[in-house]
A protein has these predicted regions:
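Hydrophobic beta-strand scaffold residues
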Residues: 27, 47, 113-114, 155, ...
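Anion (oxyanion) recognition and catalysis
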Residues: 21, 41, 107, 149, ...
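Helical "substrate-binding/catalytic lid" subdomain
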Residues: 164-280
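Rossmann-fold NAD(P) dinucleotide-binding segment
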Residues: 51-112
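Amphipathic alpha-helical hairpins
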Residues: 15, 53, 60, 66, ...
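Rossmann-fold dinucleotide-binding core
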Residues: 94-177
Length: 282
């Protein structure tokens, strides 16, 4: 039975702890807001007063914290109490730059560290499903593969480049935000046209554009802008979208229209829609 410390028991961290307790791990928890940690006592968790108290004697330490600054603060607080051989696994959605800067400091202090952000909701964490991205030393990954696999549906090892998982996590989250913004703009058009939002969404029961991330994205990454949907024609459709909203506030489409105009002005009008990436893909 593993002895685990878990620092940061908010929505996601608390759900991860629930899953660990169900699997039989001994878990000591700490949270800046103590009440969130205390809520896990009834399930069998032990609550520590400080990060150092939490990690003392633990075989592995998991973290799900708000941001890079707090990660650095908490790691500095518990490092003197960390058991020899303990492995620190950070599930925080942290910046690639912050993670890259953090790793040499941890190495110098003798801390064994993996960065392992996740794509999962709290309920997915309870049910041990979802996707976990892992970056860090191969030997540490191999040692932790079994317990990490128990936490999620799939573990994707991205190699020893320590900030790669952080980068991939924000790439993925960016698409979540784009989808939410795009749906908002669909609702704006629907409102302008007098169509209920729930009705507007039914188009996506038949037309499912998610596959274009791979299909068009591959071409864009290679700077292959041979047209299957000419940018100047896409810009015409964009005009129809903006007009349909009849002045309703929109989140993302006006910015895309601006990027289209800039690309057309640079001579990409007869290229593919993906040519809006020409300025950033070299």
């Amino acid at each position: 039975m593993a002895s685990v410390a878990f620092l940061g028991t908010g929505l996601l961290g608390g759900a991860m702890v629930e899953g660990m307790l169900r699997r039989g791990d001994q878990v000591t928890v700490w949270n800046r807001t103590e009440a969130k940690a205390r809520a896990l006592e009834a399930l069998g968790a032990k609550v520590a007063a400080t990060p150092g108290d939490a990690v003392a004697g633990a075989d592995r330490v998991h973290m799900t914290l708000p941001d890079d600054a707090i990660v650095d603060q908490i790691v500095a607080a518990f490092t003197p109490r960390l058991a020899a051989g303990a492995i620190v696994i950070d599930h925080t959605t942290a910046s690639p730059q912050g993670t890259k800067a953090r790793i040499p400091r941890l190495n110098a202090a003798g801390v064994k560290f993996l960065h392992a952000p996740v794509f999962m909701s709290p309920q997915m964490a309870r049910d041990s499903i979802g996707l976990m991205l892992v970056s860090g030393p191969q030997a540490l990954y191999d040692a932790m593969l079994a317990p990490l696999s128990a936490m999620t549906g799939e573990v994707w090892y991205l190699g020893e480049e320590g900030d790669r998982a952080a980068a991939y996590k924000i790439f993925g989250n960016s698409m979540l935000f784009v989808i939410a913004a795009g749906v908002t703009d669909v609702f704006a058009m629907a409102k302008g046209l007098g169509i209920p939002a729930t009705d507007a969404l039914t188009v996506f029961s038949k037309f499912q554009p998610g596959g274009l991330i791979k299909a068009r994205g591959d071409k864009m990454a290679r700077r292959d802008f041979s047209a299957t949907f000419e940018l100047k024609m896409a810009r015409k459709d964009m005009r129809l979208m903006l007009e349909a909203a009849t002045g309703q506030p929109m989140v993302v489409l006006p910015g895309i229209a601006k990027a289209m105009d800039e690309a057309i002005a640079k001579g990409h009008g007869q290229d593919d829609l993906g040519a809006i990436a020409a300025a950033v893909v070299k």
